[in-house]
Amino acid sequence: MYDYIKGTVTTITPEYIVVEAGQIGYQIITGNPFSFQRLEGTEAQVFLYQHVREDNISLFGFQTTEERYLFKKLLSVSGIGPKSALAIIASGDVVPLISAIESEDDVYLTKFPSVGKKTARQIILDLKGKLADVVASEIVYVAPENDMVAGLSPQLEEAVLALEALGYSTRELKKVIPKLAKEADLTSDAYIKLALQLMTK
């Protein structure tokens, strides 16, 4: 099983990129190959998922471990294959996706290729409440000097900083922090789940 590849991006096509490492060119399927265009001709690190079938072995590539974990979560949903999962996260912005799942917004989910209403409902059924832990564990951040988290418990502070790293604004977070602070003794994951629920109401 491969975790990542580090090499030179030599080729970019509408469906895949080629990364050369150790004088071998690896064809890697990505959601948006052209997002690697700025890296063409330079060394890049691409996180990998190896998909094995009887007649084919494919490598799927991601720019972050967060994208890869979401891809794997989507693969666990009945009716979602690798190509569909890749298309869902191809936009590169996972915040609306997570928010749609948490708020049961099947209309938003049906905008993705190969996702009808039945599949959208299945995604919500299988993944609602199960993505916050992935987000919390996969986002790497450095805690800044931030007045917004002053005086909060370590668990709530970690949750707020993770949500901030996801792209939620200070204004959005300040609205929910007082409500979160009333809930004592929650884990960071639980605070994130609760915050997502509050912000999508």
Swiss-Prot record:
Gene Ontology terms describing biological process: DNA recombination; DNA repair; SOS response
Q: Where is this region: Domain III?
A: 153-201
Cellular component GO terms, alphabetically?
cytoplasm; Holliday junction helicase complex; Holliday junction resolvase complex
CDD domains hit by this protein:
UBA_RuvA_C
One annotated GO molecular function is:
four-way junction helicase activity
Region annotation (Flexible linker) maps to 143-153
Keyword Plastid attributed: no
For region Domain I, the annotated ranges are 1-63
Family annotation (Gene3D superfamilies):
5' to 3' exonuclease, C-terminal subdomain (1.10.150.20), DNA helicase RuvA subunit, C-terminal domain (1.10.8.10), Nucleic acid-binding proteins (2.40.50.140)
- Give positions of region: Domain II: 64-142
- Record Pfam families: HHH_5, RuvA_C, RuvA_N
Domains (record comment):
Has three domains with a flexible linker between the domains II and III and assumes an 'L' shape. Domain III is highly mobile and contacts RuvB.
Function, please?
The RuvA-RuvB-RuvC complex processes Holliday junction (HJ) DNA during genetic recombination and DNA repair, while the RuvA-RuvB complex plays an important role in the rescue of blocked DNA replication forks via replication fork reversal (RFR). RuvA specifically binds to HJ cruciform DNA, conferring on it an open structure. The RuvB hexamer acts as an ATP-dependent pump, pulling dsDNA into and through the RuvAB complex. HJ branch migration allows RuvC to scan DNA until it finds its consensus sequence, where it cleaves and resolves the cruciform DNA.
Q: Which HAMAP family match?
A: DNA_HJ_migration_RuvA
Similarity field? Belongs to the RuvA family.
Q: What is this protein called?
A: Holliday junction branch migration complex subunit RuvA
Q: Identify the gene encoding this protein.
A: ruvA
